[in-house]
């Protein structure tokens, strides 16, 4: 991608030929990309480019493909292995035929999935997994209720499925359109409430009168009053957005915990 202008300008998104990545060293593997996925992070990275300077960047942080070369320290994969991964923000992305990626943030592609299906999973699934099990510390014996806002989205859909498959926590999902409501119910949501309803808090509390134990939210802006109302004392919230001006003081009276989930923190900071 090249920064600058609206998408109707021909050179904003460029089909370009660039030098092939260098031979992999260390823990890097070189992957022939067979399929990729598009995510909000692509838009965010592109928006941060130097528009005036015409900065260029290979986007893409979800891929599936085949290993064609490995570094001297690799132990997990060898040429010919099919893999899938999200990659790291600091490196060129998957919108190319070849990509270098650290094997330690790569997984074997499930044999039951084709490349396109596998490429749709890493970023959303890892985000949902870390939100539930690293941030909220849910486990097999966990109970209570989680409110999943934006439940029909990519991450929300995975949050529902992982919660129902791996815990005893009940799921209240928000959705608006009939298709979205049917979708989240098909994934296992125990109850569905109207995402845009003015009485959303009342709908949630009608299902969980004492408040929900946990909340997953993909968007924080304007949500703190709702969350203050529907989360029980000592409850927990995990958010995945980039809201910079967020006043959380209203949560203090109930000692509600707020967690940030950022999937790229692990490859960036170890």
Where are these regions (language model features)?
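Mid-domain Rossmann-like dinucleotide-binding core that forms the NAD(H)/NADP(H) cofactor-binding site
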Residues: 119-197
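Glycine-rich beta-strand-centered segment in the early N-terminal region that forms part
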Residues: 19-37, 47-90
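Glycine-rich phosphate-binding loop and adjacent beta-alpha segment
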Residues: 222-270
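Short, glycine/polar-rich helix-capping loops at beta-to-alpha or helix-loop-helix junctions
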Residues: 94-95, 175-183, 245-248
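N-terminal Rossmann-like NAD(P) cofactor-binding module of classical short-chain dehydrogenase/reductase
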Residues: 84, 213-216
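A structural motif shared across PLP-dependent enzymes of the aminotransferase-like
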Residues: 90-103
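Residue-level recognition of short, solvent-exposed, well-ordered loop/turn junctions
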Residues: 24, 78, 139-141, 232
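Short amphipathic alpha-helix with an adjacent loop that forms part of the alpha/beta core around
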Residues: 199-210
